Amino acid sequence: MAIERTFSIIKPDAVAKNHIGAIYNRFETAGLKIIASKMIHLSKEQAEGFYAEHSERPFFGALVAFMTSGPIMVQTLEGENAVLAHREILGATNPAEAAEGTIRADFAESIDENAAHGSDSVASAEREVAYFFSAEELCPRTR
């Protein structure tokens, strides 16, 4: 099995509802280690930069507005097949389609306010981690 890193965001809706601890518990219970974490309030420029690949999509403005509406938690997770493991814990993007017991089924209200983000590939994870964390901020856990 491959040890990977992935990037995760707990979005403003879930932060506002105090779900941070419950979501972190899901990560750790699944064997993912949190090796970097911080709470930030994205600026419009930061949100537009992070979601630049969606800039031509009709939902881009609403996405940026939502992601800047309150603080978020950003974290880097490490573990076996971390990208896939994290996406399985999150569940389907639309919480109405998410499997029971997943983060989005349990904590999200709608497809627009769906509680969390997870990298969709190792390449995306590397780019997304680097967007928010310097190498010095990553703390691999060896114990």
Swiss-Prot record:
It catalyses: a 2'-deoxyribonucleoside 5'-diphosphate + ATP = a 2'-deoxyribonucleoside 5'-triphosphate + ADP; a ribonucleoside 5'-diphosphate + ATP = a ribonucleoside 5'-triphosphate + ADP. InterPro entries: NDK-like_dom, NDK-like_dom_sf, Nucleoside_diP_kinase, Nucleoside_diP_kinase_AS. ATP binds at residues 11, 59, 87, 93, 104, 114. GO terms for cellular component: cytoplasm. Its cofactor is Mg(2+). One of its GO terms (biological process) is CTP biosynthetic process. The keyword Protease does not apply. Its main location: cytoplasm. GO terms for molecular function: ATP binding; metal ion binding; nucleoside diphosphate kinase activity. Signal peptide: none annotated. It is found in: Cytoplasm. Keywords: ATP-binding, Cytoplasm, Kinase, Magnesium, Metal-binding, Nucleotide metabolism, Nucleotide-binding, Phosphoprotein, Transferase. Coiled coil: none annotated. Its EC number is 2.7.4.6. The active site is at residue 117. Major role in the synthesis of nucleoside triphosphates other than ATP. The ATP gamma phosphate is transferred to the NDP beta phosphate via a ping-pong mechanism, using a phosphorylated active-site intermediate. Belongs to the NDK family. Homotetramer. This is Nucleoside diphosphate kinase. It comes from Shewanella pealeana (strain ATCC 700345 / ANG-SQ1).
